[in-house]
Amino acid sequence: MKSLKAYAIAAHFGPTMLITTISFLLAARLWWEGPAYLIAFTVFLGQLLIGWSNDIYDYQDDLKHNRVNKPLVSGQLQIEDLKKATFILLPIALLANLLGPLGLKGGAVYLLGVGCGIAYNFYFKFRITSPLVYFIALAALPASIFYAVDRNPPLWVLATSSLLGVAFHFANVLKDLSADRDSNIGGLPQRLGRRASLVIIAILLVIVLTILLNSPISSTFTSRVI
């Protein structure tokens, strides 16, 4: 049981379950609960890949900053075991998303989002373009589920999802700004600093709220599956 908990923590369990829950609720709304559970599970597998690859890549930096809340640093989990689990999971996640209820199109779109998450871990968190992968990945999630039910995702859904993703990126970085700079992590929030990041978060949330207040939410999130 302790080992399972360590794997869950290494997957960044909070954000992973948040994305998984959102996917279930959206799928249940657009389809029905049966495939929604399967979609949530396949989404969960993709999020595991993002979380685990992040902790694998950050291992040396986490050791440097003595982040004992990380299972790899505390010794609850060995890095070779996490690498092995990640490589085993990779083909399973690919097949589950492409051959599952998301379908080839929906699965490919969702996997694009997963790829963005992994690309952030290894490359984009050091670049000024760091918000770009959040923008794409968070749009890919709802888009994949709309495609699964043969519907085109409305632009307002893509816009709000993308902007919320970018806002989350800025908010998520705030607590680690000084440590990130010490580790030469130079994403856009780290370059702009706390005050500018807070302003950007506020602006993005106002834009999202404005879009939502002027969008046909109830009619959009209605199942058309007979």
Placement of each model-derived feature along the sequence:
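Multi-pass alpha-helical membrane architecture of UbiA-family
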Residues: M1-I226
